[in-house]
Amino acid sequence: MLRKVFYISDGTAITAEVFGHAVLSQFPLEFDALTIPFVETEKKAEAVKAQINDCFITTGERPLVFHSIVKAEIRDIIYSSEGLDYDFLNTFVAPLEKQLGMPATPALHRTHGKTNDSYEARIEAINYAMENDDGQTMKHMDKADLILLGVSRCGKTPSSLYLSMQFGIKAANYPFTEDDMDNLKLPDALKRNKDKLFGLTIDPVRLHEIRQSRMSNSRYSSMRQCRMEVKEVEMMYKRERIPFVNTTNHSVEEIATKILEATSLERHMF
């Protein structure tokens, strides 16, 4: 039986999940996880406590409870359960209060809530990424913070959306297709924004596997076509002095981090 894990918060529970995943990923085990957001009342907290206690009775093992709860009275109810508590916020707040010489002023939903102009900036960045995905339009490239380039299925769209959602970066992306390969060059709209260009590449074998799952036994997915496209695009990156990273076997989080590290783009945290 898998060890039970609870991610609990009086907000979205995103912080608790991220913290918990980071810790649990250090162990080569699988877990049975349950996320419970918006535990904003004592009544809800008592219900969650009952779930945790029932789990302990059923399994005979104390559940792992990762939480980021602002309200002390709700936090105390979770503390009184049979779970093993890992309190992300309170672990660090008290030492910081001492160092900063002032008490914390807890507020619900401050971390991932709709509280200020930064929220609107994030929505604007997400809308921009969707409107400028896959070369749909070249009219607004001058408004981009970043323009990702690459062959089809190398990770441009998920990387653009992740950068916009997590960091408020206006990321457009442009694909190089089979039709471009005979005379591969940058379109004028990209040339005018060359300082914003960043390339993605991928191992041809992995690209072949991805394309096969989408359009099997086609020219588009053939090993020969994949090798040719990757080779031509990488040669163009080098010719035009466009920085690029290899996305093979990397998660979208890792790809985004590599891009940010290479470009020194400012992260807009929310």
Curated annotation (Swiss-Prot):
Bifunctional serine/threonine kinase and phosphorylase involved in the regulation of the phosphoenolpyruvate synthase (PEPS) by catalyzing its phosphorylation/dephosphorylation. It comes from the Bacteria. ADP binds at G150, V151, S152, R153, C154, G155, K156, T157. Coiled coil: none annotated. Keywords: Kinase, Nucleotide-binding, Serine/threonine-protein kinase, Transferase. The lineage of its organism: Bacteria, Pseudomonadati, Pseudomonadota, Gammaproteobacteria, Alteromonadales. Its EC number is 2.7.11.33, 2.7.4.28. Belongs to the pyruvate, phosphate/water dikinase regulatory protein family. PSRP subfamily. NCBIfam families: PRK05339.1 (NF003742). Transmembrane segments: none annotated. One of its GO terms (molecular function) is ATP binding. This is Putative phosphoenolpyruvate synthase regulatory protein. PANTHER family: PYRUVATE, PHOSPHATE DIKINASE REGULATORY PROTEIN 1, CHLOROPLASTIC. It catalyses: [pyruvate, water dikinase] + ADP = [pyruvate, water dikinase]-phosphate + AMP + H(+); [pyruvate, water dikinase]-phosphate + phosphate + H(+) = [pyruvate, water dikinase] + diphosphate. It is an enzyme of class 2 (transferase).
